[in-house]
C-alpha cells in the first residue's frame, strides 16, 4: 500500500537534521506524499529550535504546491509527571503535537518510572502521538500504555528510524506495541522520523511490523490524509479547514 502521510520529520531547525522545509516540500511532491508534519525537537533539547520557533509556525502556509504541511512539534517528556517542554495556549496553535523520551532531557531510569511518565503524558490531553515508545532504553509496561492511549484517543508510533540508525533492538518491543494497541482498540501511526528529506515517507520496516501484527488498516492513521485530519479534529485541533483542498484532489 502507498502511504501518503508522514507525521514525524525534522528540518535544519533541529541542527542534527539536514534538510530545509522547502526541500521536504519538494521531496513530498516528488514522492507523491500528500500531507506531512514538520515536528522539530522541543526546546529543551540542546540543539533544538527556540520556543518562539514553534510559536511562529503560524506564518507557514498549510498547503504549498498541493502538499499539506502540518505545523507541529516533537516535544520532550520531561519528568514522571508527564510534562512536556511546550505549554500554555501556544499548544492550541499547533496542528499536531508529538512527544517522546530523549536522553538529553529525561535520562533512562526504570520501567515503573518510564511507564508512569508516559501514561501521565497521555492523560494530560496535550499530546496527540507518543513517539518511538518501543525504544529499548526506556522499557515500559506495554499493555498499560496501550490501554491508556486507547482510552485517551492518543496514537502510538511505530518509528521507522528505530530499525535503521537509532534505538537498536526496537523490533521486539514495536511488534508487542502493535499487538497491544490492536487488542486495546487503539490507534497506530508510522513515522519516518526523517532527519533528511530523502527518507520522508519511508515506512519500509515499520510497515513490516504493522503487517506482522495484522493491525487493522482502519486504525492506522497513515492510511489517508482524511484519516489523520479526522483524528486531529477529534483531538480538538480547530484550524484544519485549509487542508480541504487535499481531500478534493
From Swiss-Prot:
Keywords noted in UniProt: Hydrolase, Metal-binding, Zinc
GO molecular function: phosphatase activity; zinc ion binding
UniProt entry tagged with the keyword Endoplasmic reticulum: no
Binding-site positions, Zn(2+) 2: 16, 41, 195
Enzyme class: hydrolase
E.C. number(s) listed in UniProt: 3.1.3.-
One of the GO BP terms on file: bacterial-type flagellum-dependent swarming motility
InterPro entries listed in its UniProt record: Phosphatase_YcdX_put, PHP_dom, PHP_phosphatase, Pol/His_phosphatase_N, Pol/histidinol_Pase-like
Entry keyword annotation includes Zinc: yes
Coiled coil (UniProt feature): none
TM spans (from-to): none
SMART domains recorded: POLIIIAc
Co-factor: note: Binds 3 Zn(2+) ions per subunit.
Residues the entry annotates as binding Zn(2+) 1: 8, 10, 74, 193
Cofactor: Zn(2+)
CDD domains on file: PHP_HisPPase_Ycdx_like
Protein name: Probable phosphatase Shal_1519
Organism whose genome encodes this protein: Shewanella halifaxensis (strain HAW-EB4)
Lineage: Bacteria, Pseudomonadati, Pseudomonadota, Gammaproteobacteria, Alteromonadales
Amino acid at each position: 500500500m502507498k502511504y501518503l502521510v508522514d507525521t514525524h520529520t525534522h528540518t535544519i531547525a533541529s541542527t542534527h537534521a539536514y534538510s530545509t522545509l522547502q526541500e521536504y516540500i519538494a521531496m513530498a511532491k516528488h514522492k507523491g506524499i500528500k500531507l506531512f508534519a514538520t515536528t522539530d525537537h522541543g526546546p529543551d533539547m540542546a540543539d533544538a529550535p527556540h520556543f518562539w520557533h514553534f510559536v511562529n509556525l503560524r506564518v507557514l502556509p498549510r498547503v504549498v504546491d498541493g502538499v499539506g504541511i502540518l505545523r507541529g512539534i516533537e516535544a520532550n517528556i520531561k519528568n514522571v509527571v508527564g510534562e512536556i517542554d511546550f505549554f500554555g495556549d501556544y499548544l492550541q496553535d499547533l496542528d499536531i503535537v508529538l512527544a517522546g523520551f530523549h536522553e538529553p532531557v529525561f535520562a533512562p531510569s526504570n520501567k515503573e518510572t518510564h511507564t508512569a511518565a508516559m501514561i501521565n503524558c497521555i492523560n494530560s490531553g496535550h499530546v496527540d502521538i507518543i513517539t518511538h515508545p518501543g525504544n529499548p532504553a526506556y522499557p515500559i509496561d506495554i499493555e498499560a500504555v496501550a490501554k491508556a492511549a486507547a482510552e485517551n484517543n492518543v496514537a502510538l508510533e511505530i518509528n521507522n528510524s528505530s530499525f535503521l540508525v537509532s534505538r537498536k533492538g526496537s523490533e521486539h518491543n514495536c511488534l508487542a506495541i502493535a499487538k497491544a494497541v490492536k487488542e486495546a482498540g487503539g490507534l497506530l501511526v508510522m513515522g519516518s522520523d526523517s532527519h533528511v528529506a530523502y527518507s520522508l515517507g519511508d515506512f519500509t520496516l515499520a510497515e513490516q511490523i504493522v503487517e506482522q501484527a495484522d493491525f487493522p488498516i482502519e486504525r492506522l492513521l497513515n492510511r489517508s490524509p482524511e484519516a489523520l485530519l479526522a483524528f486531529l479534529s477529534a483531538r480538538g485541533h480547530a484550524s484544519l479547514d485549509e487542508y480541504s483542498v487535499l481531500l478534493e484532489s
